[in-house]
Amino acid sequence: MADLLAIKARGVGERIVALAAAGTPVVGICGGFQILGREVRDPHGLEGAVGGALPGLGLLPVTNVLELEKTLTRATARHAASGLTVRGYEIHHGQLEGDGWEPGIVRADGATVGVSARGGAVWGTYLHGIFDDDVFRRWFIDGLRVRRGLAPLGRPVAVYDLEQAFDRLAETVRANIDLQAVLRLVGLA
């Protein structure tokens, strides 16, 4: 709730709302998701006075209620707009309330962990790490590219050859560090 107060006090909240009204895509992860909703309620005083509530930015038709039990789990879910399976983790006290939302991201067990509005231009999720997935990230960035009049790339451009990267790192260390001196300093030689 402190983050919500801070962005409102600095005028950032108004700017986010104005950008969304102009059609700019807006995404919120976890606390950002809660901020995008209608209201954040704190009936147990986890982040403020017991029974406290703050109006959110009103961009998503949800209320987040902070519950005593914290959700802490890895999750696999389906992102509705892209049709892609996404993975990440949840770490939050929030529980969704509301109606009229588009369930944008749904876990395998049927729980909604992400909501979208304005035709998918505004969305939020409890799922941390969603952009770590190369295919999902490419889908999202391609959508932004199309909005700017650029052609989508259509495929992830990241290449991860960890073995080769570790070999290069090891060679660089061997070439530039006196390992025997380091071992002597730490008492291992």
What are these regions, as identified by a protein language model?
Residues 1-87:
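Cysteine-nucleophile active-site neighborhood
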Residues 17, 21, 62-189:
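Amide-donor transfer/coupling interface in amidating biosynthetic enzymes
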